[in-house]
Amino acid sequence: MGRIARGSKMSSLIVSLLVVLVSLNLASETTAKYTYSSPPPPEHSPPPPEHSPPPPYHYESPPPPKHSPPPPTPVYKYKSPPPPMHSPPPPYHFESPPPPKHSPPPPTPVYKYKSPPPPKHSPAPVHHYKYKSPPPPTPVYKYKSPPPPKHSPAPEHHYKYKSPPPPKHFPAPEHHYKYKYKSPPPPTPVYKYKSPPPPTPVYKYKSPPPPKHSPAPVHHYKYKSPPPPTPVYKSPPPPEHSPPPPTPVYKYKSPPPPMHSPPPPTPVYKYKSPPPPMHSPPPPVYSPPPPKHHYSYTSPPPPHHY
């Protein structure tokens, strides 16, 4: 009985294990089937290709950008420039941006350049206004006013010429000449000839002659003095004296001193000084340089890094 019980237990265990295994297998199979069932959707690749056409459709959409709506807007902008007749505002706007870039200094120059343009624009409107109507009136009025002044002198001249005509008559000229010599004309010309011209030329002619005579006496004096030049010929003998030669002799005497031994001593002293450097001490002095070089190499790197 015990064996049977044991056998039944074992069989139940085996059955349970088998059931578990079968269930697991089924589950794995179901899962495998599911996994296999899922691949089929990927196999429905045709739909994606069908969906792929939409991209071409999207590419077909670009034509909308091809539509001219946007260009019309810029065209309209170019149509607006007619108001550009008020061009000063745009330049003013374009000139104002630079100041922001150069915060303090540029503003002043920009303002300077801003002020000139207005005057330039002002003449244009004035010209326009002139061409509209003012031009004719202005020149006409100008030409109307000048003639009067021109005529004004003419009348005066006419008045002058009006009085001469009477003198043109035979008796009139005689009276005119007589009258001129009597008082009006004579005084002016007589006064002119009496003092201004005569004194000046007389004084001029009086002063020049003396200078002309002065050179003659000078020449005369020169001709009187020529004899002294003969003493000049007498003076040459002094140069003949031997004093000059002594100077060159002294010059030749001076070179010898440099040739004396004194100069050599100086070079000897120079040669005496070099030997000390030849002593062994200098090498030790040269030994320090390595550390200096090392120190120099240590210091430069930081600047390079910076």
From Swiss-Prot:
GO terms for molecular function: structural constituent of cell wall. It is found in: Secreted, Primary cell wall. Transmembrane segments: none annotated. Keywords: Cell wall, Cell wall biogenesis/degradation, Glycoprotein, Hydroxylation, Repeat, Secreted, Signal. Residues 33-306 are annotated as: Disordered. Hydroxylated on proline residues in the S-P-P-P-P repeat. O-glycosylated on hydroxyprolines. One of its GO terms (cellular component) is extracellular region. Pfam families: Extensin_2. InterPro entries: Extensin_dom. One of its GO terms (biological process) is plant-type cell wall organization. Residues 1-32 form the signal peptide. Residues 38-122, 133-152, 183-214, 225-290 have a biased composition (Pro residues). Structural component in primary cell wall. This is Extensin. It comes from Daucus carota.
